[in-house]
């Protein structure tokens, strides 16, 4: 599985293209559709997943075929073509926030829930400190060697970020 990070928009949002066997899943097409489309190349888009519905994560969504956009993944396990992943509801930054966890690959796409050296803001519309604390408790049960791909900034390891969770709990 290949992971491409494309930084888009004036808030430098990370859009991810996860590809395997000529197919791909797009996570958070925040802006700059042409840049994303160029990175996709000739791969077939089989799904678009949004980690949460803030404008900087959905700006280019309107340019994609509605047949591949999955607006509301429910918590649980999914198997789409060659991709297996889990959806974990991680409220706090926003009430609709999710984390996409590829268990076999040991990677998580956290949107604006967890960043490298921080957590998501809770002072924006839809933010909630109690939900954030619950979500941090849930995620803290996962393995330290999981790679976190956040909605902004560089990737990190869950174990590194867990060391800072107590600052927020």
Positions of predicted regions on the chain:
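Conserved beta-strand hairpin/beta-sheet module of binuclear metal-dependent hydrolase folds
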Residues: 1-40, 99-111
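Active-site HxH/HxHxD metal-binding segment of metal-dependent hydrolases
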Residues: 12, 24, 29-86, 164-167
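Active-site metal-binding loops of divalent metal-dependent hydrolases
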Residues: 29-31, 53, 92-94, 106-107, ...
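Active-site environment of divalent metal-dependent phosphoester hydrolases
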Residues: 33-34, 53-59, 95-97, 115-117, ...
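Conserved catalytic scaffold of divalent metal-dependent phosphoesterases
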Residues: 74-78, 83, 93, 107, ...
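Residue-level signal for the nucleotide or nucleotide-sugar donor/cofactor binding architecture
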Residues: 85, 126-127
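Divalent-metal (often Zn2+) His-rich catalytic cores of metallo-beta-lactamase-fold enzymes
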Residues: 107, 131-169
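Short glycine-enriched, charge-decorated loop/helix-capping segments at active-site entrances
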Residues: 120-126
């Amino acid at each position: 599985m290949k992971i491409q990070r494309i930084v888009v928009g004036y808030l430098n949002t990370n859009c991810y293209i996860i590809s395997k066997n000529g197919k791909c899943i797009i996570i958070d097409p925040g802006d700059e559709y042409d840049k994303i489309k160029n990175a996709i190349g000739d791969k077939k888009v089989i799904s678009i997943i949004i980690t949460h519905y803030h404008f900087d994560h959905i700006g280019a969504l309107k340019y994609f075929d509605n047949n591949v956009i999955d607006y509301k993944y429910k918590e649980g396990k999914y198997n789409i073509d060659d991709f297996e992943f889990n959806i974990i509801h991680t409220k706090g930054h926003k009430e609709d926030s999710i984390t996409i966890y590829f268990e076999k690959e040991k990677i998580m796409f956290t949107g604006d829930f967890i960043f490298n050296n921080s957590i998501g803001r809770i002072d924006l519309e839809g933010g909630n400190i109690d939900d954030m604390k619950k979500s941090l408790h849930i995620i803290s049960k996962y393995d330290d060697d999981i790679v976190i791909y956040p909605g902004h900034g560089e990737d990190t390891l869950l174990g590194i970020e867990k060391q800072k969770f107590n600052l927020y709990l």
